Structures are given as C-alpha cells and as structure tokens.
C-alpha cells in the first residue's frame, strides 16, 4: 500500500501552516465559511499561502457558497483544490477550473457508493461524521464499517481523528488520505504544534 496522504484543515495562522508542512503534511485546508470559527479572510489566506514551502497543496473549503462568491475568492486566492462541504450538487461543484473533492457526511443507511458515482468529476470523496445542522468539524468519529470496499474514488477519511486513533483508522479503512482539524488544536482555529507532530508521526508509523 502506498503512503497515506494527509491534510491539516482549518489553518488560520502562518505558524500553523508551517508547522503542518514541517511535520510532513501534504496539504492544508483553508475554510471560507464565515460561520466557522476556523474561517479565514482572503487576506489571511493569501498571507498563509505566500509563506508555504513548495509542494504543499492548498485546499479551499466552501459550504453552499454561491458561484459569485467562489469565483471572487478564486480570483483573489491561489488555491490548488476545492473542497465542497455542504449540499452542493454535482453541477454546482463543476466549472471552476480546479480539481475538487466532495465531502459526504456519513450515517447508517446511506448508499455512499451511489453518491460517489453521482459526483463523477470529483477527484476524491471526504467522508466525515454526520451531525445534524453541522457541516463539518464535529470532532466526532463515525462507524468506519459503514464505508463500502468498492468506492470508485480515493477516500479521504475525516471525523474525530487524533494521534490516538489515526493509526487504527488507517489500518481498518485503508484510505487514500486522512484529514484532521480539531484533533490537532489548542482551541478552535489555533493549532498545537506538538499535536500536529504526534498526529503525523502516527500517520507515518514513526
């Protein structure tokens, strides 16, 4: 099995982005959802991206944003990839000249495989915990046994991951990548360098 990739999401500070890069993260997530405590402004995002070393993918997270809002952000911020974390339809995810991943909030009874096929142009699916009224960042895990073995897209596993459970998650789910936010924080939006290092060490098995 190839190495599992990783994204540290909800970055709001330059020092946290650099800590993620130094620890070996492949990507950082920048939240453009004003209701989130981890939201960043265009100016914050530009400063964070400008400080990054090479080969760190920048992912912009959006929740039910209008096409106008998204295009304005993309005109101002050099994002490599988009993450749609709301109720966006496949058509609403297309047309931005950026690769995208679609977040799915998992609950019992969902036909995850069918939903994945619906988002035919998605580069991958991010599987997160379903909590009613909360689009993401719940800090809670879900039953990984609900994930089908035959998904036709790379799986990015999210939802309540920490340094204490990510190795087990990787062994059980065998995802393409893992995504963490709250599991490496001091408080919402403020990352903890030691927690980032511990998480990445667990991901890499070192």
UniProtKB/Swiss-Prot annotation:
Record field: transmembrane: none
Q: Set out the biological process GO terms recorded for this chain's protein.
A: L-tryptophan biosynthetic process
Example of a GO MF term: phosphoribosylanthranilate isomerase activity
Query: Under which main EC class is this enzyme filed?
Result: isomerase
Pathway connected to this protein: Amino-acid biosynthesis; L-tryptophan biosynthesis; L-tryptophan from chorismate: step 3/5
Q: Which UniProt keywords apply?
A: Amino-acid biosynthesis, Aromatic amino acid biosynthesis, Isomerase, Tryptophan biosynthesis
EC number, as in UniProt? 5.3.1.24
Does the keyword section mention Membrane?
A: no
* Catalysed conversion reaction: N-(5-phospho-beta-D-ribosyl)anthranilate = 1-(2-carboxyphenylamino)-1-deoxy-D-ribulose 5-phosphate
Q: Does the keyword Isomerase apply?
A: yes
Similarity field:
Belongs to the TrpF family.
PANTHER family from the entry? N-(5'-PHOSPHORIBOSYL)ANTHRANILATE ISOMERASE
Q: HAMAP family given for it?
A: PRAI
State what protein this is by name. N-(5'-phosphoribosyl)anthranilate isomerase
Q: Which organism is it from?
A: Pseudomonas savastanoi pv. phaseolicola (strain 1448A / Race 6)
């Amino acid at each position: 099995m190839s190495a599992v990739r990783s994204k540290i999401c909800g970055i709001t500070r330059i020092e946290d982005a650099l800590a993620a890069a130094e620890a070996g993260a492949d990507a950082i997530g920048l939240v453009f959802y004003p209701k989130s405590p981890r939201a960043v402004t265009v100016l914050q995002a530009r400063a964070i991206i400008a400080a990054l070393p090479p080969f760190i993918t920048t992912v912009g997270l959006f929740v039910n944003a209008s096409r106008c809002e998204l295009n304005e952000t993309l005109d101002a911020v050099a994002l490599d990839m988009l993450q749609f974390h709301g109720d966006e339809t496949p058509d609403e995810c297309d047309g931005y000249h950026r690769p995208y991943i679609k977040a799915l909030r998992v609950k019992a009874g969902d036909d995850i495989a069918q939903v994945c096929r619906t988002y035919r142009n998605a580069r991958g699916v991010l599987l997160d915990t379903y909590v009613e009224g909360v689009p993401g960042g719940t800090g809670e895990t879900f039953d990984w046994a609900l994930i089908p073995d035959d998904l036709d897209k790379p799986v990015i596993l999210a939802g309540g991951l920490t340094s204490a459970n990510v190795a087990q998650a990787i062994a059980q789910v065998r995802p393409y990548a893992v995504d963490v936010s709250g599991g490496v924080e001091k408080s919402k939006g403020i990352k903890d360098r030691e927690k980032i290092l511990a998480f990445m060490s667990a991901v890499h098995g070192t």
